[in-house]
C-alpha cells in the first residue's frame, strides 16, 4: 500500500514539473492543424511536443508510407480503411509508435528529432528519453 501511495505522489510531482515547464515556455503545446485551420481534436501527447496536430500528422504520414503499402479495401458500402495511429500508443521512452493496419500492426521508430523529454531531449539519444505518463 505504501508503494502505491508513493507512486501516486511521484506521479503528481511529475505532472507539476511538466506543467511548470510548459507554462514557462508560454506556448500552447496543442497548436493549430497543419493546414492552418482550427481543429478541436485533443491529443494525449506530452507538453514538450510543440505542435500536437503537426506531430500526429507526421506520424500518420510515416505510417501510411511504411511497407507493405496500404491496401484500400471497402469495409462496407460507405467506408474505406486506411492506416491509423493512436496517440496513446506513442512510446516516448523507446521512441516508437504503433501503426495500425487493417490486418496487422507494426511498431515504427519516431523521427530522430522528436522531443522525448522536458529538457530538450530528442530521440537522437534514446538513453536520455523519459517515459510520458498520460493522465497520471
Swiss-Prot record:
Name the InterPro entries for this protein: Salp15
What's in the keyword line of the UniProt record? Glycoprotein, Secreted, Signal
Q: What is its main location?
A: secreted
**What does UniProt give as the signal peptide span?**
1-22
Pfam families, per the entry:
Salp15
Example GO CC term: the record gives: extracellular region
Expression is induced as follows: By feeding. By the presence of Borrelia burgdorferi.
| Localization (cell) | Secreted
Q: In which tissues is it expressed?
A: Expressed in salivary glands. Detected in fed adult female.
Self-association state and partner proteins as the record states: Interacts with host CD4. Interacts with host DC-SIGN (CD209). Interacts with Borrelia outer surface protein C (OspC).
Query: Its biological function?
Result: Salivary tick protein that downregulates host immune system by binding to both dendritic cells, and CD4(+) T cells. Specifically binds to the CD4 coreceptor on T cells. This interaction prevents the activation of the Src kinase, Lck, and its downstream substrate Zap-70, and results in deficient activation of PLCgamma1, the repression of calcium fluxes triggered by T-cell antigen receptor (TCR) ligation, and a subsequent reduction in interleukin-2 production.
Task: From the Swiss-Prot or TrEMBL record, give the protein name.
Answer: Salivary protein 15 Iric-2
Which species is this record about?
A: Ixodes ricinus
Classification of source organism: Eukaryota, Metazoa, Ecdysozoa, Arthropoda, Chelicerata
